[in-house]
Design a protein with these regions (language model features):
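Extended active-site neighborhood of metal-dependent phosphoesterases/phosphodiesterases
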Residues: 86-198, 294-299
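Active-site environment of divalent metal-dependent phosphoester hydrolases
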Residues: 44-46, 77-82, 101-112, 165-168, ...
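Acidic/histidine-rich helix-loop elements
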Residues: 36-54, 75-83, 109, 126, ...
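Binuclear metal-dependent phosphoesterase catalytic core
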Residues: 38, 142-146, 242-249, 263-331
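Beta-strand-turn-beta hairpins that frame and shape the catalytic cleft
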Residues: 24-35, 138-159, 267-274
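Bacterial Sec-dependent N-terminal signal peptides
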Residues: 1-21
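His/acidic metal-ligating clusters that form di-metal
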Residues: 64-67, 156, 171-264
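N-terminal active-site segment of His-dependent metallophosphoesterases
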Residues: 19-88
Length: 331
């Protein structure tokens, strides 16, 4: 009977390869943790116009050698959806780099639902994408970053599903982060703060569609904005209060989104950095920026971080330090 249980355990384990390798994330011995954000790959499997997206992802991963890769939506833009999703995510998995995905508004328009895509992602090694029962959205998950000695949580990454299009009659445009998602964030933020003796843990958030505050910040002449802004943020018309909750909880350092292909800026707003990734896709959809990625480097025990844009040929643009580069110097 014991032998039968062992064999059954091995068989079941092999049927779930996506669950076999979910490494814990931790700061390295130098107290650093590097994240690469790819956004809006808009990959169409077999389409030559997508070749440059594969080239750039490969180049950035080989150059930066990140500890984590986050894909912030619109990974695929055509059928076959499964082959497209696997092709992109395997670029990280084949290098044994942990990765996570937050869906965009186009991912589930290619013949598969969000749930079906989520199930596919779960079968890919090194995947950290998860979901929370009872919370709206398919890709809501938390990635704690352990201290370099592995003994405690040192920072927190919140990944959220920003949904697709408005579901309210008479309200056009894009959907907003729902109240139960905000409650989920607040409850977990409070939990981590309590575990840390009452001090909020440094946190970052990643999702696809920008918050309304992006437009508010970018149009304020007193706010410091670094990078390219060639289009207004296509944010929800309604504001559900996610940014206000981030301020109340006191843990959030930066928010990183995609969706608007001609933006890659970072703007300092009320103490939080509101940033875009860099469009990563090819010519399968509109774009006026050469493709690349955003890189974020956190330091253990610090409420500051570095971020930059990585482009073709190893070029780096817009390297900044948060918050020091966004605070106006007194005369």
């Amino acid at each position: 009977m014991k032998q039968l249980l062992i064999i059954l355990s091995l068989v079941l384990g092999n049927l779930q390869p996506g669950y076999a390798q979910k490494p814990a994330l931790k700061f390295n011995k130098d107290g650093k943790f590097k994240i690469v954000q790819f956004t809006d790959v808009h990959y169409i499997h077999g389409n030559p116009k997508s070749a440059v997206s594969l080239e750039r992802i490969n180049e950035v991963l080989d150059t930066e050698k990140p500890d984590l890769v986050l894909f912030t939506g619109d990974v695929i833009y055509g059928q076959p959806a499964e082959e497209g999703m696997r092709t992109i995510l395997n670029l990280a998995a084949n290098r044994k780099i942990p990765f996570g995905v937050t869906f965009g508004n186009h991912d589930d328009e290619q013949g598969l639902t969000r749930t079906q895509l989520f199930d596919i992602i779960q079968t890919i090694p090194y995947n950290l994408t998860d979901s929370v029962a009872g919370v709206v959205g398919a890709t809501n998950f938390i990635l704690p970053l352990k201290s370099s000695d592995g003994k405690k949580d040192a920072a927190i990454l919140y990944c959220l599903d920003s949904h697709s299009y408005s579901q309210i009659k008479g309200i056009g445009g894009y959907d907003y982060i729902k109240f139960d998602q905000i409650r989920w964030y607040r409850e977990n933020s409070a939990k981590y703060t309590k575990q840390n003796g009452g001090t909020p843990l440094p946190s970052l958030a990643f999702f696809h569609i920008a918050l309304p505050e992006y437009n508010q910040a970018a149009s304020d002449e007193t706010a410091i904005l670094i990078g390219t802004r060639k289009e207004k943020a296509c944010a929800p018309q309604l504001n559900s209060g996610m940014f206000a909750s981030m301020k109340e909880m006191g843990d959030m350092l930066g928010v990183f989104v995609g969706h608007d292909h001609d933006d890659d800026y970072a703007v300092f707003w009320k103490g939080i950095l509101l940033a875009y990734g860099r469009y990563t896709g090819g010519d399968t959809v509109y774009n006026n920026l050469s493709n690349g990625a955003r890189v974020i480097e956190m330091t253990e025990g610090s409420t500051s971080f570095k971020t930059w844009i990585r482009l073709k040929g190893g070029e780096v643009i817009n390297p900044v330090n948060y918050p020091s580069d966004f605070i106006k110097k007194k005369d």
